[in-house]
Amino acid sequence: MKHADLSQRQLRVGEQVRHALAHMLQRGILLDDALKDVVFSVSEVRMSPDLKIATCFVSFLNTVDDISRATLIKVLNKHSRFIRGEISSSLRQMKYMPELRFRLDNSFDNFSKIDALLRLPEVARDLHHHKPED
């Protein structure tokens, strides 16, 4: 689902959930030993149309391989009820507390791949060659 497909309400509530998650993470509540030394960011939260499901996209900033990232996503999903309870006080205005589902956000990895491609000598030469004159 693209941003254009989401209503203003879904976008607003998603941002509120993201802020509540960020606030909880800043307090340093450790959920699991697997998350002890992991630095991660909740980059986006997308709400379902009925606002009962929040899909939370997470980027890990200091993990190397995809296997450990997948494991960490499983750990977050395992503790989603606890996290939901922790953020509920920040979201008291909501009629229903959404179910949290954590997913890996690959946008930073995709950006890195595109950046690396654009830095290739062949691509840089082509881009420079087709540059319009001022």
From Swiss-Prot:
Q: Establish whether keyword Secreted is in the entry.
A: no
Q: Which residue pairs form cystines in this protein?
A: none
User: Out of the domains of life, which is the source?
Assistant: Bacteria
Report the subcellular localization. Answer: Cytoplasm
A molecular function (GO) term: ribosomal small subunit binding
What keywords are annotated for this sequence in UniProt?
A: Cytoplasm, Ribosome biogenesis
Any one of the GO CC terms: cytosol
Described function: One of several proteins that assist in the late maturation steps of the functional core of the 30S ribosomal subunit. Associates with free 30S ribosomal subunits (but not with 30S subunits that are part of 70S ribosomes or polysomes). Required for efficient processing of 16S rRNA. May interact with the 5'-terminal helix region of 16S rRNA.
Q: What protein family is recorded?
A: Belongs to the RbfA family.
The protein, known as: Ribosome-binding factor A
Gene designation: rbfA
